[in-house]
Design a protein with these regions (language model features):
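Intrinsically disordered, low-complexity terminal tails/loops enriched in metal-binding residues
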Residues: 23-164
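Bacterial N-terminal signal peptides that target proteins for export
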Residues: 2-12
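Serine/threonine-rich, low-complexity intrinsically disordered segments
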Residues: 5, 21-24
Length: 164
């Protein structure tokens, strides 16, 4: 009886370890795939840029900058991409993040539904650009924050998940 119990425990432990190893081994591959899709959709090499996703009381912002001040091409591509994103999001079109992440990010359905309640302002910044997102609608605000928190986690930016 004790031998049977030990074997069951060992088998369960081995299955748990194997599952952990498989999931852990696939994580970098999932990140690599997301980054490849992102490079294709955004039109620039993510490794040459820095993404920031910031939560604010009225919404938040998406900021992307070239890592090197002399990387004029990346800065140009960032500006083109974020200008396009601001227009797409204002129209309720979130195809770009859905393609990059291979799923519908949290908050997107509500942001699409309440698109008339949300403003997306494009702004050029040093070495890149930003999209400032704002709303006075509490439901839209919650959705914006869900969307930005998802971006922070997916892109592993280390940005605060708190409203600043």
């Amino acid at each position: 009886m004790k031998t049977h119990l030990r074997r069951s425990i060992m088998a369960s432990l081995m299955l748990a370890i194997a599952t952990f190893v498989i999931v852990y081994a696939q994580e970098p591959k999932a990140d690599e795939q997301m980054n490849k899709r992102g490079d294709h959709v955004m039109g620039f090499d993510h490794a040459k840029t820095t993404h920031l996703f910031l939560l604010r009381e009225s919404g938040g912002s998406i900021e992307i900058t070239a890592n090197k001040s002399d990387d004029v091409e990346s800065s140009k591509q960032i500006r083109m991409h974020l200008k396009h994103i601001a227009m797409m999001f204002a129209d309720g079109n979130f195809n770009a993040p859905m393609l990059i992440h291979d799923q519908t990010p949290p908050g997107v359905p509500v942001m699409q539904e309440l698109k008339g309640e949300i403003k997306y302002n494009f702004e050029e910044i040093d070495r890149g650009a930003a999209v400032r997102i704002s709303t006075k609608n509490p439901t839209a605000l919650k959705a914006i924050h869900e969307f930005l928190r998802f971006q922070i986690k997916e892109h592993k930016t280390g940005d605060s998940l708190d409203i600043g």
